[in-house]
UniProtKB/Swiss-Prot annotation:
Gene name, Swiss-Prot/TrEMBL: menD
Subunit structure: Homodimer.
Biological processes, Gene Ontology terms: menaquinone biosynthetic process
Keyword Ligase appears in the UniProt entry: no
Record bears the keyword Transferase: yes
Organism taxonomic ancestry: Bacteria, Bacillati, Bacillota, Bacilli, Bacillales
Official protein name in the record: 2-succinyl-5-enolpyruvyl-6-hydroxy-3-cyclohexene-1-carboxylate synthase
Listed cofactors: Mg(2+); Mn(2+); thiamine diphosphate
E.C. code: 2.2.1.9
Cofactor note: Binds 1 thiamine pyrophosphate per subunit.
InterPro entries given in the database record: DHS-like_NAD/FAD-binding_dom, MenaQ_synth_MenD, MenD_middle, THDP-binding, Thiamin_PyroP_enz_TPP-bd_dom, TPP_enzyme_TPP-bd
A matching Pfam family: TPP_enzyme_N
Protein's job: Catalyzes the thiamine diphosphate-dependent decarboxylation of 2-oxoglutarate and the subsequent addition of the resulting succinic semialdehyde-thiamine pyrophosphate anion to isochorismate to yield 2-succinyl-5-enolpyruvyl-6-hydroxy-3-cyclohexene-1-carboxylate (SEPHCHC).
Length: 578
């Protein structure tokens, strides 16, 4: 007699494949044997083995970012599942679709002291969109139909907007090994068992017309763009800006700063000049239209938060509530194309001259001043991003670590015509799991990835480097090593000289060349920008791990950074007579 696990779990895995899932990230373990073996045996599913569960969770996250569809994440019972938690949280807040399948002991072995058995019910709390504890395997037609329906529902829940993680806890009795000779994927197969149809999110036309009529009469407006995924959405936003003659304040994750599209209306230096009160007042808008999550820039956030006279319109197709300013806003839950068409219908075509030109003037002057800063100083981290955007291979991706790297990208990354994409984990903004996320992204895009990361974040996720060795992933790591938490040097904590280094600076003194040796990668530590280019360009699109370490100084960079921006402010205000 065939073990019921074979056709029950086989049908489960098969329905995921029929529903469009192509990838499963699997962590080794005994209780998850049927899930792992049958996923590996399925002809339409690619299995990615990750030994460490925390790393695996973030690898799946990066893979799902690349695929823009759900990815399965499989582990055994016990604390293995708990190690997925940070990645599940990030997936929740960044709206990335994951299907977490945790194997479990059968009901009779729960809460009785059985080994490797913990309470896995609602393990991820409110950070998953859907949770269920599946029934124990049975082979009768009703149960095979049930488990297929459950798989289809999981894919639907993870993929519908707002996308996010779902969790199915799968109790399994021994024997755990399925019979691969028993045609495990064919029972109850009748095409796709569950089909879900979705469409473009629209909005009440009367309400939308009222909002767009208000915008049509606005002369001083701007568009703010956070992270954006689709090319069509980018083009719609550019078309809207051209129609309204509003500047676009483009976060680096919007990918509006790079690519072949027209960038005449793109403002890329706003993080620098919005720190000055006089410049802010001169550029103060009456209305702001925002797409995507709140951008990285703190000066922009504070401006929108603290000026109640700025009317805010937040367009969010997913129907979420992404407004940390809490300054009051019009929440518009519709697809950007619907919003664009409504504005087009209400637009009068009259716009005063001078408003857009003001933004362009300030932006160009600030960008010119930042470009004129010394390019020879290897200790100035801002130069990394100015160099990198001209060196990164066309069609590749840059994954940016949190803390200082993403902020420096925001400040120093210029608009230009080369085609690549910029990614980061900005859901919960943690420094953990960044290496593994970049690895998953690289595997998903099948194109080179350059990871820019600080030393503490790199240390957090050294385990993630194993994927580069095992899979031959073309990952180049630009390691910004200031021996500690560089961001704290910009914060008030730095004034406490007694406790700062111990509690916040946290130097490690690690020699990272050994990490390259451990994981079979190359390592260089250039001392000039020419040496940096010579180290980066030949390796950037080659398979395997390549670490380029840039040693910088936390203390001196703070003053250099401040002096640079203050000098730019003085020059622009003098020229503008502010």
């Amino acid at each position: 007699m065939t073990n019921p696990i074979t056709h029950y779990i086989g049908s489960f895995i098969d329905e995921f494949a029929l529903s469009g899932v192509t990838d499963a990230v699997v962590c080794p373990g005994s209780r998850s044997t049927p899930l792992a073996v049958l996923a590996a045996a399925h002809p339409d599913i690619q299995v990615h083995i990750q030994i460490d569960e925390r790393s695996a969770g973030f690898f799946a996250l990066g893979l799902a970012k690349a695929r823009q569809r759900p990815v399965m994440l499989i582990c055994t019972s016990g604390t293995a599942a708990a190690n997925f938690y940070p990645a599940v949280i990030e997936a929740h807040y960044s709206r990335v679709p994951l299907i977490v399948l945790t194997a479990d002991r059968p009901h009779e072995l729960r809460e009785v002291g059985a080994p490797q058995a913990i309470n896995q019910h609602f393990l991820f709390g409110n950070f998953v969109k859907f949770f269920t504890d599946s029934a124990l395997p049975e082979e009768n037609p009703q149960m095979l139909s049930y488990i297929r329906t459950l798989a289809g529902r999981a894919v639907s829940e993870a993929g519908k907007r707002p996308m996010g993680p779902v969790h199915i806890n799968v109790p399994l009795r021994e024997p755990l090994m399925p019979d691969l000779s028993a045609a495990p994927f064919e029972r109850m197969r009748k095409g796709r068992h569950v089909s879900v149809t979705t469409g473009i999110q629209s909005a009440d036309q009367d309400s939308l017309c009222h909002i767009t009529e208000r915008l049509a009469g606005t002369e001083r407006g701007m568009i703010v763009c956070g992270e954006i995924h689709g090319e069509a959405e980018k083009q719609q936003i550019i078309a809207l800006a051209e129609m309204l003659q509003f500047p676009i304040l483009a976060d680096p994750l919007s990918n509006l700063r790079n690519g072949k599209h027209d960038k005449t209306l793109i403002i890329d230096a706003y993080d620098s000049f919005l720190k000055d009160e006089a410049i802010k007042e001169a550029l103060r808008p009456d209305a702001v239209i925002r797409f995507g999550p709140m951008p990285v820039s703190k000066p922009l956030f504070l401006w929108l938060r603290d000026d109640p006279a700025i009317e805010q319109f937040i367009v969010d197709e997913d129907g979420g509530w992404r407004d940390p300013t809490q300054a009051g806003a019009h929440m518009i839950h519709c697809h950007p194309s619907v919003f664009l068409e409504a504005v087009r219908s209400a637009e009068t075509g009259k716009r005063p001259s001078g408003w857009l030109e003001k933004w362009q003037f300030v932006n160009e002057r600030f960008r010119s001043h930042l470009q004129a800063a010394s390019m020879d100083d290897l200790s100035f981290e801002g130069n990394v991003y100015r160099q990198l955007q001209h060196l990164v291979p066309e069609g590749s991706s840059i994954f940016v670590g949190n803390s200082m790297p993403i902020r420096d990208v925001d400040t120093f990354f210029e608009k230009q015509d080369r085609s690549f994409r910029v990614y980061a984990n900005r859901g919960a903004n943690g420094i953990d799991g960044v290496v593994s996320s970049a690895m998953g992204l690289c595997e998903g895009t099948k194109a080179p990835v350059t990871l820019v990361i600080g030393d503490l974040s790199f240390y957090h996720d050294l385990n993630g480097l194993l994927a580069a060795k095992k899979l031959g992933i073309p990952l180049t790591v630009i390691l910004i090593n200031n021996d500690g938490g560089g961001i704290f040097s910009f914060l008030p904590q730095a004034s406490d000289k007694t406790h700062f280094e111990e509690l916040f600076g946290t130097p490690t003194g690690l020699d990272f060349r050994h990490a390259a040796a451990l994981y079979g990668g190359t390592y260089t530590c250039p001392e000039t920008w020419e040496a940096f280019k010579d180290a980066y360009q030949p390796q950037a699109d080659k398979p395997g791990l390549h670490i380029i370490e840039l040693k910088t100084d936390r203390t001196s960079r703070v003053q250099f950074h401040r002096d640079l921006l203050q000098a730019a402010v003085r020059e622009v205000k003098k020229e503008w007579k502010l």
